[in-house]
Each structure stands twice: as C-alpha cells, then as structure tokens.
Amino acid sequence: MDNKLEKMKELVEELNQYAYEYYVLDNPSISDKEYDLKYDELVILEKKTEVTLPYSPTQRVGDKILGEFSKYTHKGRLWSLDKAQNMEQLIEWHNRNLKVIEQYNSMSEDKLPELRYIVTKKFDGLTVNCTYDENGILIKSATRGTGIIGEDITAQIKTIKTVPLKIKNNHIIEVHGEAIMTKTAFEEYNKAAQVPLKNLRNGAAGALRNLDIKETARRNLSAFFYDVGYNEGSEFKNYREMMNFIRNMGLPQDKYIKECTNMEEVEKEIEYIESIREELDYDIDGAVIVVDDIKTREILGYTIKFPKWAIAYKFEAKEITTRLLDVEWNVGRSGRVTPTALLEPVELGGVTVKRATLNNMDDIKRKNVKLGAKVLVRRSNDVIPEIMGVAEESLEESKEIQAPDRCPYCNSHLVQNGVHYYCENTLSCKPQMVKSIVHFASREAMNIAGFSEKTAEQLFEKLDIKSIADLYKIKKEELLTLEKFKDKKSQNLINAIQNSKNCDLASFIYALGIPNVGKKTANDLVMKFKTLESIKNTTIEQLVEVPDVGEIVAKSIYDFFEDEKIISNIEELLNLGVKPYYEEERIDENPFMDKTIVVTGSLNNYSRGEIKDKLQSLGAKVSSSVSKNTDYVLVGEKPGSKYEKAIELGVKVINEEEFSNKIK
C-alpha cells in the first residue's frame, strides 16, 4: 500500500508539472500520449487504493451536479476599483496621490519613495478568490460577491486547467484573479452548443455560476492572477515583488506588466493596450493602474468602496444604433421626474439593451432625440445605456417628445426647476414615498429587518403612511390586514421598527435621504460635528471642511436642513423615540497606545488581519516597515527581514507571549 501511495504522489507531482508546462508556459516537455499513459496509471491506482490526493489532476474532471452555492467569507476583502473615463480624471487621481505623499513626507522622517505605478490589462471576466492552505493545497475558491462574502465555486474553479491545485508555499494565502473565456474556447464551445453563448464574459460567468460541473468543464475557462489579498507569510515591499511571488507559485499570470514613473508613460501604456485590444484571444475593457510601493498604499488608504491607490481606466464603450419606441417618465425619491427611453431591443457589449437614459428635456432637445428615430446608444462601465445622438436620415418620420405637465403617478402639476421637472406632492405621490421608506429602512440606514419595496407599497396604499415618522406609529393589528402578513411576520416587523429607534448617528443621517450624501459622507459628517444638532446648524463654510465635501454637496446638506417640513419630520421622529447616538471610541490606557508597531512572522493566536485589528483597538499605529520611529516589533515564528532590521536599529522586539502579558 505504501509503495502505491508513493507512486501516486510521484505521478500527481509529475502530471501537475506537465500541466503547468502545457497550459501556463505553453512549452510541454512530454507528448500528449505520454501524459495520457501516466494519467491512466494514476486513475487505476486511485481505484485500487480508494485514495485520492486533494491536488490530484483527476479532481479537475467535472462529473457531478451540486445542490446549491454555499457562502464563503473572504479572509481579505476584495475591493472594487474606482474608474477614470479619460486622462483628465486619471491625472486628477495622480495629483491626489502626490498631495498625500508630499504631506506625509513633510511630517515624517520615514519618507515614502518616489511614486511609481504598475500598469496591467483589465480583464473582462469574473473576479475569483482562491485560498491555498499552509500545505499549498487549493482549499477554497469563491466569487467576489459583496467583497466580504462570496459564493463557493471551488469545484468549478478546479475545472480550469491553468489553476494549480497545489503550490509550493507554507502559509495560508488568498490570491485574486479573473476567470475568463478565450475567443478560441468560445468558438469551439459554440460549434457544438444547442444554445450558443452570446459573449465571452457571460460564457465565463455562466460557467462558474453553474451547478452542473460538467457544463463548467465544457467551457474550458482560463484565468489570470494579479493580487495577493491575504497573506500569512512574509510581507511584500511592492507590487512587483507580489507579482513575482504569484508567478513563482505557478499561478497563471499575464505577461504584460509595465512599470511607469510618470503619467506620460502611463498614458503611453494605456494607448498601447487599447491598440492591441482586438488582437488578443480574450476580452479586456481597460487598463488597471496601481501604486507599486506597499507602504505608500497604506498611507493613501481606502474609501468605503475603493482603494485610493488603484484605479481602472475604462476604454470607450462600443456604440450601436436602434430605434426609439417611446419615452417613460419616472419619479424618484426626491420627486424629480426623469425620462427613460424605451428602445427596440438590441445587443450591445454582450447585453440586450431595451432602455436608455435621456437625463432631462434639455438633453433631449440638445441631441435632437425624437420618437421613432434611430438613435445611437452607448453602454459604458456597466451603467444604464445612454442615447448619444440620432441618425439624421431617420428624423423625417419621427415625432417630437413632449415634456409632461403632470406627474405620471399622482397627476399633480409638475414644477420646473432648472433643467428638471419635480412633483411636489411628497405626501401622496406613491413612488416618492415608497422609495423614501425603502431607503430609510435599508441595511446601511435604519436597518429595519424584513422590509421590502412590496411592504413599503402596501404601507402606502393600505395603511396611508404619508411620512417616515408614520412608520413608528404602525400597530400590529394594522399589519395583519396586509397581504402575506400573518402573526409572526407582523410581530417581527413591529419589533424591527422598534429596535431601529436606537441607531448610530451616521446611519440616521444617511437614512434621511439628503441629496448627494452617501454613507461615507454621513460618517464623515458625524466624525466632524459629533451631534445631530451641530449638523443641522452648520454653515456651508464649515461643511466644505469635511473630507470630500465640495460646494455642491455642502449646499445640498445646508438646504436640506433649512427646509421646515424636513426639520418638523426629524423632530417628530425624535419625539417618537428615535435616538441617534454617537460614541467616540474610548481606549483604556495600555503600553501600546500611540505606539508604532511592526509585525513579522506567524503568530499562534492571531491571523495577520486579526493582530492588526487588535493593535489598532489598543490605539497603536501598525506599520509595514521598520524604522527608527518604530516603537515595537512583534515577532512570531519564521520572522523575515524586519526582525533583522529591528535588531540592527535597536528597536525593542517582543514575542507573542510578552505581547499577551502586556495587555492583560
């Protein structure tokens, strides 16, 4: 038995190496026939021993249908990227980076290096996260999902022959990549498919979101990896070092990786990538530009959605012509009435387009858009398509688009304000009230569990809810009269509404629906002004001092709290028991408060993310590099060069046991 197991291990190692040479390096060292003979020998041994190694190439064969997708919590967050539509926006991003670095260097002896960027292609596929354990074995693969929680697609990823099932690494890591379908694989699949695929991206996404693993395998996906999102091993100094690590682990990586020292070089590389776009065997939709130095990334930081040290440059979208059939007028949460174009269905960028934005009547007139005309439609950055203009020859049989004078929902007279039309019937205009209630109850706002748009519609139509404050007056017996509301569901909603009364101030500010104020801005307002009363009474001059708040947003906030109806509504909420609170985090006195600490090596009781959170909760600043300004270096097993640097500089070194004793 032992001899057979040893032979199996030998065959698995050989076959995985041959697969890497064939699929990743495109440089096979043996013939297909030799490979097949070794593969068949492995299959026979696995049947005889009833043992299959977790990284055996036989595990790539899709021969099962899964019941459902389970959730997976990523160890490290998968961030989205901010987008630049043109070089002006890209240069603005670059200038913001320069400003932060200059400010940091002027205040710190530990200077940041000159700004360098790495430019890569932006693949148009599906983002995936692969987790390898301390033995180097692929143990989990997942979709991006929310960035924090994704769906387990381990079985699907194992069908991708370029993704190694085992790597030579002895620490837990998560690597991020893009699963793609090549044009070659797309054409081969469609030759035999009963229902042909429409585009490469849907081909890849559909394969990974398919519970039939055989179907996933048939699509013959590929992948490129470009980021280490979680790492319990030695830290990287820069992105080039990270990319070298990814390549040395045998993970497939695109060969195009360019280092740039200025924006002229970045622009040149973007132009080059766009010039070869059509020649590639896979789809790309732009370029990704990231800061090379890891410490600089830490200083630049993050927004709620994006890292500030990376940006995607999106290529100009493709355009297509179709016919405008009609215009639909919709009412938003603010009462603004906006036109939406109803189009003759057409394929654009892999999506069937039936609707497009028209913005407002001024936009319609400026573009000379008319009913029945052929219009030029552009779809860009996964947002709703936009009408860019009309085909002049189609205007002869077209009709003018008439601006509405009454609300399409409540029939109230509309009021024009600038280029927009508004319905001022805030109390009985259904879409306004319903959308306001849904926003107020949403998870990031008051977090009223079990609340849906259908519920909001019933509250408006059946219970005559005319303001947000009315939510807190609802009685259980009233809910029981609504469709699908039994005793338990009614009581749960009553409980959720009551529980929402104690909410943090930032969530309450966001819930109010102030124009142009998202959750991040709400958080920033609370951090700056501390109380609801202070925010209500602030001036435009004070508001523009808040990070990322310009004059337009400042005026929106100021005007919002000048509205007597809004102030009255807020006061009613407070009188009904809503108690928004703000608590500044209090940190007890401890040896690490206000100290700069560097962590190196593996700790027994903390992952890298956990120790960082723990130190920050103690009021410490966690740094990625050792300098004379470092107060402590916390050392675990197998420390890296940071330990040597600490000894060299005379920085105090402590182990995990000493750390634990100090915080008891």
From Swiss-Prot:
Its EC number is 6.5.1.2. Its cofactor is Mg(2+); Mn(2+). NAD(+) binds at D32, K33, E34, Y35, D36, S80, L81, R144, E178, K314. Residues 587-664 form the BRCT domain. Zn(2+) binds at C407, C410, C423, C429. One of its GO terms (cellular component) is cytosol. Pfam families: BRCT (PF00533), DNA_ligase_aden (PF01653), DNA_ligase_OB (PF03120), HHH_2 (PF12826), HHH_5 (PF14520). It catalyses: NAD(+) + (deoxyribonucleotide)n-3'-hydroxyl + 5'-phospho-(deoxyribonucleotide)m = (deoxyribonucleotide)n+m + AMP + beta-nicotinamide D-nucleotide. Keywords: DNA damage, DNA repair, DNA replication, Ligase, Magnesium, Manganese, Metal-binding, NAD, Zinc. The active site is at K122 (n6-amp-lysine intermediate). GO terms for molecular function: DNA binding; DNA ligase (NAD+) activity; metal ion binding. One of its GO terms (biological process) is DNA repair. DNA ligase that catalyzes the formation of phosphodiester linkages between 5'-phosphoryl and 3'-hydroxyl groups in double-stranded DNA using NAD as a coenzyme and as the energy source for the reaction. It is essential for DNA replication and repair of damaged DNA. PANTHER family: CHROMOSOME TRANSMISSION FIDELITY FACTOR 18, DNA LIGASE. Belongs to the NAD-dependent DNA ligase family. LigA subfamily. NCBIfam families: dnlj (TIGR00575), PRK07956.1 (NF005932). This is DNA ligase. It comes from Clostridium botulinum (strain Loch Maree / Type A3). The lineage of its organism: Bacteria, Bacillati, Bacillota, Clostridia, Eubacteriales.
